[in-house]
Amino acid sequence: MASTGVYPPQSDTYLLARTLLGEPIEPGTRVLDIGAGTGYLSVSAALAGSRNVTAVDVAKRALLNTRLNATLNGVQIRAVHGDLTNPLGENNFDLVVSNPPYVPAAGDTLPTGGLARCWDAGRDGRAHLDRICREAPRILAPGGVLLLLQSALSNIDATQRELQRQGLTAEIVSTAQIPFGPVLTERASLLRQRGLLAPGEDREKLVVFRAVKPSGAA
């Protein structure tokens, strides 16, 4: 269930959920969902067996939606208000999932409210991706896994480099090609001007990175 003003589950959500369910999830697996939205991924992890799921979102409305969906599905989720990983401690999570905003925007000023906050990610689409890549080693337990979804429009190679720079091993484990939704349809002209889209291109490539913190890392 998606409440008014909360990003509803879409193709990117489902791609990441399928990838998440390919990971070993046990009752003691500590799972974190960054940018939880409706809580679809958090609920998926809890239904898969984790009894220790944390959902974080900057929007209080999203956290209410997450709590509601947890109740409707008979699972318990700790919903935390905060900006990405800021409210979280160190080395706490075995599995981190995130479907952050990743759509390149006209400028670098990020929305502070409204649905656009769910997809606008600065001029290069990397405002949130780069932060998650940099902060993941701090919140992951040794041997922990990050599953991070993004669009090819927001520079796949940059994510690979940044994850490796942070000492994580990283690879793409899931991909999908999806038709443009309303946001990319409206923004296609701008993205073509920047050389991010070819003339007539109307499908978006999505990828999921799987990044692992070494078992011996602090």
Identify the function of each model-found stretch.
Residues 74-84:
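Conserved SAM-binding strand-loop segment of SAM-dependent methyltransferases
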Residues 85-96:
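A short acidic, Gly/Pro-enriched loop at the edge of an enzyme's catalytic core
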Residues 1-48, 59, 86-87, 186-217:
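SAM-dependent Rossmann-like transferase core, predominantly class I methyltransferases
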Residues 5, 126-184:
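Conserved Class I SAM-dependent methyltransferase catalytic core
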Residues 52-57:
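Conserved SAM-binding motif I beta-strand of class I
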Residues 50-51, 144:
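A short helix->loop->beta-strand "cap" motif at the edges of active sites that frequently abuts
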Residues 100-128:
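Mobile active-site "lid"/loop adjacent to the S-adenosyl-L-methionine
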Residues 66-67:
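Conserved SAM-binding loop
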